[in-house]
Amino acid sequence: MGITVRKRNGSVEKFEAEKINRVVVWSCEGVNDVSPSDILMKSQIQMYDGVETDAIHDTLIKSAADLISVESPNYQYPAARLLLFKLRKQAYGGFEPRPLYAHILMTVARGKYDEHLISDYTKEEIEFLDTVIDHDRDFDYTYAAMRQYEDKYLVKDRVTGEIFESPQTALMLIAMCLMSKEDPKKRLQKVIDLYNMVSTMKVSLPTPIMGGVRTPTRQFSSCVLIESGDDINQIFAAVEAQGKYAAQRAGIGLNFGAIRGQDAPIRGGEVKHAGTVGIVRMYQESLGWASQGGLRKASANYFYPIWHWDFENLIVMKNNRGTESTRARHVDYGVQINKFFYTRLQKGGKISFFHPNVANGDLYKYFFSDQEAFAELYEKLEADPSIPRKELEATDAFTRLAQERSQTGRIYIQNVDHCNSNSPFLPDVAPIKQSNLCMEIALPTAPINNIKDPKDSGEVALCTLSAINLGKIEKLEDLEEPVMITVRALDNLLDYQNYPVLAAEKTLLRRTLGIGWTNLAYYLAKRGLKYSSPEAANEVHKLAEAFQFYLLKASVQLAKERGACEWYDQTSYSRGILPIDRYKKEVDQLHTAELQQDWESLRLDIALHGLRNSTLSTMMPCETSSQITNSTNGIEPPRGPVTFKKSPAGMLPTLVPGVGEEGVVYEYKWDMNGPTAYLNLMAIIQKFIDQSISTNTFYKPWDYPGGKLPIKIVLRDLMYAYKIGLKTVYYQETRDGEDEEDDGCESGACKL
């Protein structure tokens, strides 16, 4: 008797080698420079009686994936197709997808899809949309992309691992959900437009949308910003808000900077304050149980001002020294600075540390809302011997900051004055007091007093993300259509989703969006431009200008249809101030480009109709979606032609797009002479966009004497970033000789 195999459904049949050959040959059809026989030879399948067909299939997938290299990049596609074959068999029982209407009915009945899909759309509409789905677009994905779909995006039972759909079905359902409340006469076309944008990889959606829209859990904002006040009720309200959002797919930015430091008097001296270290540890521990539906670990970034009384205890909380009781290593930290403190550093002065509630909280308030008033009050408090304060040389304080940043890579910087001067919000009405997990969001917040009170004055800020794939852009005008469709879809999402915390519903009054880019490096490489070239600076200026112009144009169009957002009067746009009016002028020394768009016409349009959205743009990390769209990560220069990214399936080889193609010339991160040229491009982008940028610094230690990065270089670059107007600085990367690329923002939430 011959060898038998056991199929997924438990049945047993005779092993047929020809079936394996046919599948491998099929996976290579139409793909240049790949060999079915090489895949089969590498697989060396170990046959034995009763072997499971899934095991055979997994071996073939691994065999094809192991052949992926810079020399043979196209093995990405047979590996992806073999994995797709497996996923479709799991979802549909065979390779051909189930009819869409029957599939929706079945999956709604299983509790995996939101039932509004069958109440908002008729059977006839769904059957029509089924004819639009192009399942062959699944063949355009690389192996890394298909693994991301399997691991993060496809609706599945996260306990058993059972998959319920394939990529194109998921994308059509996302489009149906986001356009479900559009005018029924125009709705189907809007569904098709969004589906085509996403399925042809012109637009990239974030993990919460990709993994969540179409399911009954309706929370899709990537970034959540929570502010804690100094009152005990506010401290615990922040804990509860953090927990609710961390459990529902969001990354957390939490500002505890208003909380008094150690030994501050409570109730007129009845009690001494225990300090912020224990509170930060409590915040960290409350993240631990938030599973986020199996999609990612809960992650957070905690903010405080450099002049906080507890600075010396807080700045070391990320490092591996000290005891557990004095550390909270599983979160990141954002240190808030302004020009006043950089000037103290430059002039060799001192930094005085105060409790944030000093002067009835005015010092803390002015730190964000009024820079002149802050400097005046700070110096007045320094001169008053009755005010408790501690003191360090500015060089000592900044050196400690730079050392911790270098050792951990994850002590971030928020330049709060830039966040409020180059802002779409009026700082005296809606100041920016923190950022988010990945440092690209800058939105107003306010402490919550009672999380269950609908009249509470607290505000949790939310931002909903997306990115335009610049690899698909040939000319600047190509930006307009994907931008228009994306702004509409994300604005719809704000009304479509639920708000687990009442204070977050103020998002509906601001309607904040954060649309950015992915694949900038490929965009430049196709044009033969290096990050460090003057030509790249001018090209990025034109690109960023057109991008923001089209975003504002799209939001004006929505305002004409639906009205301006309710809190439009809190924006600088309502005062006639555009991005071209409020940026830091030093950036214009970095390029020679002239403005190309008709800003005065747009200014008039905004004055007449307002904007639907308080914010529209940001530049986020794109580690995950860059794999889906086969693009370079966001606005970052790639580390090399191939990197390996962690996934549940192991290390995924990821190649930059166009590698080896004639005329495609990349400038890789580790070939650059430090981060200066990259920082210049980021500053040019920051000139136009509403919020901030996940801007990194990066170093090769062996470029410096003794193979050690000098702290003065770290400080030089932080001060340079400030000088050219950057609002935030994210990771410090240090080359360790490996080509592994971690998934950056651990939660995956506020990145794409």
What kind of region is each of these model predictions?
Residues 11, 34-172, 176, 189-195:
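Core nucleic-acid recognition elements
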Residues 34-40, 54-55, 70-78, 185-193, ...:
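Flexible, glycine/charged-enriched surface loops at secondary-structure junctions
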Residues 42-43, 61-63, 79-85, 197, ...:
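A glycine-rich phosphate-binding loop feature that marks nucleotide/adenosyl-phosphate handling sites
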Residues 75-111, 147, 337, 419-451, ...:
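Terminal amphipathic helices with adjacent charged low-complexity linkers/tails
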Residues 117, 125-149, 438-449, 490, ...:
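Catalytic alpha/beta core of large soluble enzyme barrels
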Residues 155, 162, 169-187, 191, ...:
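Function-dense linear segments that define catalytic or interfacial modules
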Residues 197, 483-504, 529-622, 694:
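Internal maturation/activation junctions in enzymes
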Residues 271-281, 288-398, 403, 492, ...:
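Conserved catalytic alpha/beta cores of large enzymes that bind or transform nucleotide phosphates
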